Amino acid sequence: MLGIIGIFAYKLNEYFSEPVINAKSINLDASPSPKSKIIERLKKDQKIKVLKKNNNTDWWQVEIGSQKGWVASWLIQKKNYNTKNAGRLAEATIVLDPGHGGVDSGTQASNGAMEKTYTLRTALKVYKLLKAKNVHVIMTRHTNKTVALASRPALSNRVKANIYISFHFNSAGEQNAAEGYEVFKYHHNANSFASTIDKQFNNLPLYNRGVSFGNFEVLRDNKRPAILVEMGFMDSDYDFSYIQKSSYQQKVANDVTKSLTSYFN
């Protein structure tokens, strides 16, 4: 099982008529942990009954025949997905990647505030907005967890994400040496969405540094349309005065959601 911690909570009566195994094969585990004892291997297209969802992780308790156990929720295919009032965006799979986490704090502001805190807060706000639109959205982490860098694009590739967004805040290495937000892309398949979100970000109160090529592992190893957004400089007094505010994080989240809606619809 993948060791990525995410969140994938559905209202079953709204989203499923019948859950089905989507991967070639997955483990049915005795407990919601990748280190758990394996009860059996489930095969693609097997039908299961969902008994319980752990809303703080990506694990679901399921029943198949007389066996009960736990599976990773992103390996369950959604059937009869409810697209009412959501349009084509509701048919997409979006992966949100809050940068850093756990032992990796990322960069820091002059007061010691850590990048990992604000990437998570911002991504969670996007997650909430997308879920309200019935979007199939997966997060690489939803708490202060350590997530291996390579596993982030691996998850995007595995679930065949239609869009992958990695959230970050920048650092110039010297106080007040640079400022502004920036959108990075690596592969050509991300060009269109990178331009869309950059235009939407124009109403942010920070300087627009534009769209740039970014040779980052989470983009380079990602076969899906993937971007990385640096939403301001942690070591800029001006930028950080906004970064630390929930209202700025919400504004970024609103713009990301509007960009996705525009891109798909």
Labelled PLM ranges:
Residues 1-30, 38-44, 53, 77-88:
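SH3-family beta-barrel domains
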Residues 80-195, 200-203:
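Catalytic-core regions of hydrolytic enzymes
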Residues 38-74:
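SH3/SH3-like beta-barrel superfamily modules
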Residues 166, 184, 212-265:
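Active-site-adjacent mobile loop/cap segments within catalytic or ligand-binding domains
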Residues 137, 208, 226:
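Hydrophobic anchor at the start of a short beta-strand
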Residues 32-37, 145:
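Short alpha-helix capping/helix-loop boundary micro-motifs
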Residues 149-153, 211-216:
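Alpha-helical scaffolding within the catalytic cores
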